[in-house]
């Protein structure tokens, strides 16, 4: 419901960003976790849902749903550049990425510096987001947790409510203290699969098959129908104007 600022680059900047992304992507693809599905080659939301179902049906029936508050707007530049510097040693590449982060945005014809966050709308932003959150993936793997992440949408699946509450506390602390990000505790929750809405899907237990399954969430379906109705009305309006 809020306003999201987009840092739309010029044609030249977009070309440079794409070139940098093409260089960095294969390097980081070797580091990214198998359960990270957002903004990566040959990966999609449906794969994330299937992986989540496998974990739920393996006895992990308590969900830790962590909501990152305004993730793209709150990425700490110094922390991100430190992470990148562990892998990338080319000073020119580091310099270009740093300049991209602080490139700023125009609001009402006025320039504003970018002190934190990654500019949304650029070619590099999704890759930088995954580089930052790969640190979270590594921490969760180190703790032996079952998780699925699609960009900044992450769920963790565990076997008991007690474990889920403990994981919520520990992982939230790691996110805020080690990554410098903010967890929205109002939206974050511990729940069963039936109470979860993830990537537009809801989950239910099929008593005949004795397993959890997924289907488009009712809210997502309602939103889609509303959008289609708006588009249909708009199309009819155009047609009528030419009668």
State where each predicted segment sits:
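Non-catalytic terminal/accessory segments
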Residues: 1-243
């Amino acid at each position: 419901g809020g306003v999201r600022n987009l840092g739309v680059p010029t044609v030249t900047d977009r070309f440079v960003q794409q070139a940098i992304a093409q260089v960095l992507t294969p390097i980081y693809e070797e580091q990214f976790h198998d359960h990270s599905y957002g903004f990566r080659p040959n990966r999609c939301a449906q794969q994330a849902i299937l992986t989540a179902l496998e974990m739920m049906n393996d006895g992990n029936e308590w969900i830790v749903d962590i909501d990152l508050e305004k993730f793209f707007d709150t990425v700490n530049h110094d922390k991100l550049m430190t992470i990148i510097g562990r892998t990338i040693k080319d000073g020119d590449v580091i310099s270009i990425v740093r300049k991209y982060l602080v490139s700023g945005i125009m609001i009402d014809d006025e320039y504003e510096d970018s002190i934190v966050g990654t500019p949304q709308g650029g070619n590099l932003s999704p890759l930088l987001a995954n580089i930052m959150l790969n640190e979270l993936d590594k921490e969760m793997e180190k703790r032996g947790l079952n998780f699925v992440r699609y960009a900044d949408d992450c769920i963790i699946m565990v076997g008991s409510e007690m474990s889920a509450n403990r994981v919520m506390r520990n992982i939230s602390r790691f996110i805020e203290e080690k990554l410098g990000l903010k967890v929205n505790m109002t939206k974050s929750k511990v729940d069963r699969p039936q109470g979860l809405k993830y990537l537009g899907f809801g989950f239910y237990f099929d008593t005949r098959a004795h397993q959890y399954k997924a289907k488009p969430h009712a809210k997502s379906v309602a939103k889609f129908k509303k959008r289609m109705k708006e588009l249909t009305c708009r199309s009819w309006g155009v047609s009528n104007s030419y009668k």
